[in-house]
């Protein structure tokens, strides 16, 4: 299986009482598929996977598959820092059917050595569902070494890697030794540079807000129209930046709340951002003519970075 284009790292909306808002989830999925997105990643980092129970985890993925069936690729976030837990979550997705691949994060906190990483990912890949490796050292505390990626890429079910290390050089290094192995950007602001050295797309946070625009930008770049893609990049760069002025997925959920998509509810230890960041987010949306229904105090777009 070949993955390419824009895959949205979909958020998980909550009701006022803290339960999953499946009505809002359905609306989000329908908006994504109507915009022509290539894929949806359910219950990854942006989906607040660490605070979902296993039952909720299964249900959110199942509902996403139901709502998006036949309209785009579905990637299920089933990674964990325990191999047995990753196996359990992945087996549940295989049993429900409908997912095209799983996203497997680098085991975090316990920081396994290279051989442990290799065995972990290989064990999950042996289940049969295609695997996207997720290299995110800022969260995992450890990078997947290049030699381990090379070994894993020999497995027929290891089909791609999501690169969220903030390094175009690393993408170059991967493509230099694995020219046919799929690399997906994990950073919206680095998507164009990564495509320029061989990446095939992005697992995007910003596409929660601008799915059609992100898809258009990536398609242009993949078709070789970097001048056209660069216009999108420059137009939305401030948005890419501002979605990470607080920890993800706080700012993208704040933006969706400002747009009236769902309630302003997080699960601890995540919580709302501060007023200054919220105002900046609202100003960014307004500057891009992205409709915001809530009222925020108008501020100059870049005023918080002028000191």
Residue ranges and their predicted role:
Residues 135-137, 157, 267-268:
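Glycine-rich phosphate-binding "P-loop"
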């Amino acid at each position: 299986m070949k993955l390419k284009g824009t895959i949205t790292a979909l958020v998980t909306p909550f009701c006022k009482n803290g339960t999953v808002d499946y009505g809002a989830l359905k609306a989000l999925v329908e908006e994504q598929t109507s915009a022509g997105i290539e894929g949806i990643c359910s219950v990854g980092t942006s989906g607040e996977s660490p605070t979902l129970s296993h039952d909720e985890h299964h249900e959110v993925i199942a509902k996403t598959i139901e709502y998006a069936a036949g309209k785009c690729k579905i990637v299920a976030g089933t990674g964990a820092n325990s191999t047995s837990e990753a196996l359990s979550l992945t087996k549940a997705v295989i049993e429900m059917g409908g997912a095209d691949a799983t996203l497997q994060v680098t085991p975090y906190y316990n920081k396994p050595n290279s051989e442990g990483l290799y065995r972990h990912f290989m064990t999950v890949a042996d289940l049969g569902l295609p695997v996207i490796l997720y290299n995110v050292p800022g969260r995992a505390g450890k990078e997947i070494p290049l030699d381990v990626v090379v070994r894993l890429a020999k497995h027929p079910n290891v089909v791609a890697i999501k690169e969220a290390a903030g390094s175009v050089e690393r993408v170059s290094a991967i493509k230099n030794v694995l020219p046919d192995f799929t690399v997906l950007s994990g950073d919206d602001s680095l998507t164009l540079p990564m495509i320029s050295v061989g990446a095939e797309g992005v697992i995007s946070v910003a596409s929660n807000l601008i799915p059609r625009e992100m898809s258009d930008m990536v398609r242009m770049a993949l078709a070789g129209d970097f001048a056209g893609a660069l216009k999108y990049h420059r137009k939305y760069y401030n948005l890419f930046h501002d979605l990470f002025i607080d920890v993800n997925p706080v700012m993208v959920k704040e933006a969706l709340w400002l747009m009236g998509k769902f309630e302003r509810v997080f699960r601890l230890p995540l919580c709302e951002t501060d007023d200054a960041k919220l105002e900046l987010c609202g100003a960014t949306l307004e500057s891009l003519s992205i409709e915001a229904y809530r009222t925020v105090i108008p501020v100059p777009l870049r005023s918080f970075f002028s000191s």
